[in-house]
Amino acid sequence: MGGVTLEKIRIGIVGYGNLGKGAELGIRQNKDMELVGIFTRRNPNSIKPLTEGVKVYSVDSARDMADKIDVMLLCSGSRTDLPVQGPEFAAMFNIVDGFDTHNKIQEYFESVDAKAKESKKVAVIACGWDPGMFSLNRLFGEVILPEGKTYTFWGKGVSQGHSDAIRRVKGVVDAKQYTIPVESAIELVRKGENPELTTRQKHIRECFVVVEEGADKERIEREIKTMPDYFADYDTIVHFISLEELKEKHSGIPHGGFSIRTGRTGINNENKHTIEYSLKLDSNPDFTANTLLAYARAAYRLNKEGVFGAKTVFDIPPAYLSPKSAEELRRSLL
């Protein structure tokens, strides 16, 4: 295989928000891939891609390009978009997505799997960093330390969903919400003390909020702090700031977190062990997009071998993520 020019994997991107833009840039770093087109629900003429020469199409015209795209990256939201788009696109393409509503993954998997099996395509779902990379590390932790406890901490980072929830409060102009892990809780876990931690003991939510002139700040703060599913179960800090300060100091989309497994071995369980995987990301969408691209390579290869149906990170051999041959991997990384 050495010296032979391989055909490039032809990638399509559905959705051109932060994740779609991250995928477009990520393709530049993967020499075995090329971007065929971006698909949007907006007016295609209103979008100016970062890459010269890349065409933008209406999402409705995707079905006409089934023979021109090897893998479609679905860079849409998990709440309302992916539950519809996942099955729809799996009926036509190999797909990859970062579906991240944890408690609905099995239901989503089943709906995508049915369509991918009908079309004989591969659909890799939920393969960002959590679910995704963290999921793999939780699995490794459980099988290596069967008697133990798994902990996941997120942050410090911007939560897009929580920021959106604040923006929906009457009188709010704009907002950013940071999820912050509680350091003392992480230290207890790292010591192998296996603490039972409540939601409130693991994370703090810090909000930077811009409000309309004359808005009732007390009411807004109360509405944020008591919002079910988002803030009611957490210690929440609310800061009211100007729009200028929000743009100047809070325009990035950083994130990160820790996946930790603690356990014991030995005749009397006297030996403590800790497995820790952590991420510190300047750009959550850029990093997530790069994980989707690695799994796009795997989806393409598996489908070439005659595999089809929905898959998760648990089902994909790690070697399929890499552009290197099996021999190169053994020589360079094993």
Swiss-Prot record:
What are the GO BP annotations of this UniProt entry?
diaminopimelate biosynthetic process; lysine biosynthetic process via diaminopimelate
Q: What is its EC number?
A: 1.4.1.16
Q: Which InterPro entries match?
A: Diaminopimelate_DH_Ddh, Meso-DAP_DH_C, NAD(P)-bd_dom_sf, P5C_Rdtase_cat_N
Q: What Pfam families does this protein's entry cite? A: DAPDH_C, F420_oxidored
Tell me the keywords, alphabetical order. Answer: Amino-acid biosynthesis, Diaminopimelate biosynthesis, Lysine biosynthesis, NADP, Oxidoreductase
Pathway(s): Amino-acid biosynthesis; L-lysine biosynthesis via DAP pathway; DL-2,6-diaminopimelate from (S)-tetrahydrodipicolinate: step 1/1
Any GO MF annotation of the entry = diaminopimelate dehydrogenase activity
Q: Does the keyword Membrane apply?
A: no
- Which reaction(s) are listed as its catalytic activity? meso-2,6-diaminopimelate + NADP(+) + H2O = (S)-2-amino-6-oxoheptanedioate + NH4(+) + NADPH + H(+)
| Assembly and binders | Homodimer.
Concerning its family, UniProt says: Belongs to the diaminopimelate dehydrogenase family.
Q: Could you tell me what this protein is called?
A: Meso-diaminopimelate D-dehydrogenase
Q: Which organism is it from?
A: Acetivibrio thermocellus (strain ATCC 27405 / DSM 1237 / JCM 9322 / NBRC 103400 / NCIMB 10682 / NRRL B-4536 / VPI 7372)
The gene for this chain is ddh
